[in-house]
Amino acid sequence: MSDIDQIPLTFTDAAAKKVKSLIEGEDNPNLRLRVYITGGGCSGFQYGFTFDDKINEGDLTIENQNVGLIVDPMSLQYLIGGSVDYTEGLDGSRFVVQNPNASSTCGCGSSFSI
């Protein structure tokens, strides 16, 4: 995709910087952050994050600062228009999904409903 406006999910600079720092210590330069959605949590769906060095057929890869974010097609349909960010604060540090498709979220922010 050459036009940034066509990318359906934003991978923020803060998230890319954190991913880059986390994978620098690993012995695998092909690692990327994978964000996915599963059923569960108190609101019906929950976000998950893992490091992955495989890109499956149909996966979307978004690059920022020479690191990648991977999203599978099933999860992407729930994340269109959203963003993956990284925050640090008094309540700790974590990757955060801002999802405009979520009709409600739980107090912890890791589960949502559509």
Swiss-Prot record:
A UniProt-annotated Pfam family: Fe-S_biosyn
Annotated Gene Ontology cellular component terms: cytosol
Keywords for the protein's UniProt record, in alphabetical order: Iron, Iron-sulfur, Metal-binding
UniProt GO molecular function: 2 iron, 2 sulfur cluster binding; 4 iron, 4 sulfur cluster binding; iron ion binding
Signal peptide segment: none
Record note on cofactor: Binds 1 iron-sulfur cluster per subunit.
One biological process term in Gene Ontology: iron-sulfur cluster assembly
Gene3D superfamilies given in the database record: HesB-like domain
Keyword match Cell membrane: no
Keyword Iron-sulfur on entry: yes
Family matches, as SUPFAM superfamilies: HesB-like domain
Taxonomic superkingdom: Bacteria
Cofactors named for this entry: iron-sulfur cluster
Binding positions for iron-sulfur cluster per the UniProt entry: 42, 106, 108
Protein function: Required for insertion of 4Fe-4S clusters for at least IspG.
UniProt record similarity statement: Belongs to the HesB/IscA family.
PANTHER family: IRON-SULFUR CLUSTER ASSEMBLY 2 HOMOLOG, MITOCHONDRIAL
Subunit structure: Homodimer.
NCBIfam families for the chain: iron-sulfur cluster assembly accessory protein, PRK13623.1
Protein name, UniProt field: Iron-sulfur cluster insertion protein ErpA
Organism: Haemophilus ducreyi (strain 35000HP / ATCC 700724)
Gene name tied to this protein: erpA
